[in-house]
C-alpha cells in the first residue's frame, strides 16, 4: 500500500486528522508526525509489535532505545523508576522543548523500548500536533526520528517518503518543521549527569541549570 499523506496545521491541528492518526497508533501501527525539531515516528510504546514496527521501518539496531514523547512532567514520571532531583530541575526549565532526558525506566515499559538497557529517553515536545495526538491516543507515544538509521533527520514529509517509502501507512504533513538541530540528550544517574548528544540546548546551558 502506498503511504497516505494527510495535511495538518501545526498551529491549529484539525481534530478529525488527529483522531484519524490516533486510530492508527491505537491499532499498533507507526505514523510519521511533525515535532518541534524534525519529523518523528509515532507508535504505542506499550505495544510490542508496534515497537518492532518502528525498528523495522527505520532499520534501527534493537540495542538502541526509542525516545518517548510525553505531554507533561507528571506523565513522564509514570515511566521513571527512580527520579533524580536533576530530572525535575531540567524538565521544569526546558520542557516543553528540545531536551531529552535518559533515566531508569519503570517495568511498565517493554524492555525492547529501552533497547534492552532498562533506561528510557523522555521528551515533552513543544508541538501542538504531538500534544493533541498524545491526548487522542490516551498516553505517551514514541518519538524517534522519522528516517532510516544512519541517514539525515527529515524536516518535511517528502524527505520521509524518500527514505522510508511505503514502510509507513500514514504521514501527517505540516510542511517544514524548520528544524536544524535535534534535541539535546542528557543522561541522569543519581547525582551524576552527562550530555550524550549536544543539540538545540548547548552543554554549558545544562551545566548552568544544574550548578546555579
Language-model segments: which ranges?
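Active-site-adjacent structural elements in enzyme catalytic cores
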Residues: 1-212
Amino acid at each position: 500500500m502506498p503511504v497516505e499523506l494527510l495535511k495538518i496545521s501545526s498551529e491549529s491541528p484539525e481534530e478529525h486528522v488527529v483522531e484519524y492518526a490516533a486510530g492508527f497508533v491505537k491499532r499498533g501501527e507507526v505514523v510519521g508526525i511533525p515535532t518541534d525539531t524534525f519529523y518523528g515516528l509515532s507508535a504505542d510504546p506499550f505495544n510490542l509489535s508496534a515497537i518492532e514496527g518502528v525498528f523495522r521501518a527505520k532499520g534501527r539496531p534493537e540495542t538502541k532505545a526509542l525516545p518517548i514523547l510525553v505531554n507533561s512532567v507528571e506523565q513522564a514520571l509514570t515511566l521513571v523508576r527512580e527520579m533524580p532531583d536533576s530530572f525535575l530541575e531540567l524538565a521544569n526549565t526546558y520542557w516543553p522543548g528540545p531536551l531529552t532526558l535518559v533515566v531508569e525506566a519503570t517495568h511498565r515499559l517493554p524492555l525492547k523500548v529501552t533497547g534492552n538497557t532498562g533506561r528510557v529517553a523522555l521528551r515533552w515536545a513543544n508541538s501542538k500536533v504531538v500534544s493533541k495526538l498524545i491526548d487522542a491516543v490516551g498516553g505517551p507515544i514514541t518519538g524517534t526520528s522519522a528516517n532510516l538509521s544512519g541517514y539525515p533527520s527529515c524536516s518535511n514529509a517528502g524527505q520521509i517518503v524518500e527514505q522510508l517509502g511505503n514502510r509507513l501507512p500514514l504521514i501527517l504533513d505540516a510542511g517544514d518543521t524548520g528544524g536544524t538541530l535535534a534535541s539535546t540528550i542528557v543522561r541522569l544517574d543519581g547525582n551524576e549527569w552527562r550530555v550524550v548528544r549536544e543539540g538545540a540546548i548547548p552543554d554549558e546551558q545544562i551545566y548552568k541549570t544544574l550548578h546555579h
